[in-house]
């Protein structure tokens, strides 16, 4: 699920006429970087939620996103070149965005459709349409590892940027036995001195996190209930059901005109 429903208040006046995920970053709409990464990973379908200026997003990408032929021939032969897009139009249906958990609950029937014999898909990626993370790999191996465990969510954390020096979540003892060091995500008390990291907005989620007892919103969110994601995550963390790992690649929360300007001025190889 690609989150694209926010108003982008801090990005005004740019977002008065353009939804933040469509603002240009290094020659293409910001959310196109995520669509390309998903397509390169072989993800076949993405749900995009919209609210503020949502019709512009649907008009930009329509129902199918195809990779441009800029990749070399070997890459083109090894990846899926198109991505089916479904839209969850929160603004059209309810007049405003439903926040992250409310939006995911609204999109859940699209995210986890029946797979046959009454079964439903269990896990899905969630990522924001307003972060720049050009090197992230939506790894099928990460999905398989997540499916094999019992966690409700797995988060990618990043070092704290200047605008979020306090961070969001802690990271428990890291297991280095596998190919990627993984630990428990921690909901640390305010006085806890252990380091916190910033949630990158990229994560793997299990459908069960958005169902009772964790979430009381009905699948499809027919009443348009607004609900943030953080309380669900913190409750699951307190019960040991959220894992995390550190991501060290390029990552920018493109939240203000100044950050957008800096990103477009810096050379592509630079760490913003």
Which ranges hold each PLM region?
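Short glycine-enriched, charge-decorated loop/helix-capping segments at active-site entrances
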Residues: 16-22, 92-94, 218-219
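A structural signal for isolated positions on well-ordered beta-strands in alpha/beta enzyme cores
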Residues: 1, 45-47, 86, 125, ...
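Conserved phosphate-coordination/catalytic loops
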Residues: 25, 94-102, 223-227
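Catalytic-core segments of class I nucleotidyltransferases/pyrophosphorylases
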Residues: 115-116, 124-125, 132, 137-148, ...
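Structural signal for short hydrophobic segments within the conserved structured cores
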Residues: 23, 86, 250-252
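Conserved beta-loop-beta/alpha segment of the NTase-like Rossmann-fold superfamily
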Residues: 64-168, 173, 212
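N-terminal glycine-rich phosphate-binding loop and ensuing alpha1 helix
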Residues: 1-58, 69, 138
């Amino acid at each position: 699920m690609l989150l694209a429903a926010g108003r982008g208040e801090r990005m005004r006046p740019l977002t008065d006429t353009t939804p933040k995920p469509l603002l240009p970053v290094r020659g293409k709409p910001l959310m196109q970087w995520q669509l390309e990464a998903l397509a390169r990973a072989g993800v076949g379908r993405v749900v995009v939620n919209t609210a503020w200026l949502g019709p512009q997003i649907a008009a930009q990408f329509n129902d199918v996103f195809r990779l441009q032929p800029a990749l070399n021939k070997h890459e083109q032969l090894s990846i899926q070149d198109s991505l089916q897009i479904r839209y969850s139009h929160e603004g059209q249906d309810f007049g405003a965005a439903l926040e992250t958990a409310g939006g995911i609950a609204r999109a859940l029937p699209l995210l986890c459709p029946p797979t046959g014999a009454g079964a439903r898909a269990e896990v899905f990626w969630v990522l924001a349409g307003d972060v720049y993370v050009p090197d992230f790999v939506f790894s099928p191996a990460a999905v398989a590892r997540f499916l094999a465990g019992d966690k409700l969510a797995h988060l990618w954390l990043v070092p704290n940027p200047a605008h979020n020096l306090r961070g969001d979540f802690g990271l428990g003892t890291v297991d280095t036995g596998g190919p990627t060091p993984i630990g428990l995500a921690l909901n640390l008390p305010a006085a806890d001195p252990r380091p916190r990291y910033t949630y990158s907005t990229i994560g793997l989620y299990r459908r069960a996190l958005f169902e009772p007892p964790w979430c009381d919103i009905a699948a499809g969110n027919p009443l348009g209930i607004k609900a943030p994601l953080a309380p669900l995550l913190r409750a699951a963390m307190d019960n040991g059901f959220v894992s995390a790992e550190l991501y060290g690649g390029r990552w920018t929360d493109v939240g203000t005109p100044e950050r957008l300007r800096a990103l477009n001025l810096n050379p592509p190889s630079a760490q913003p």
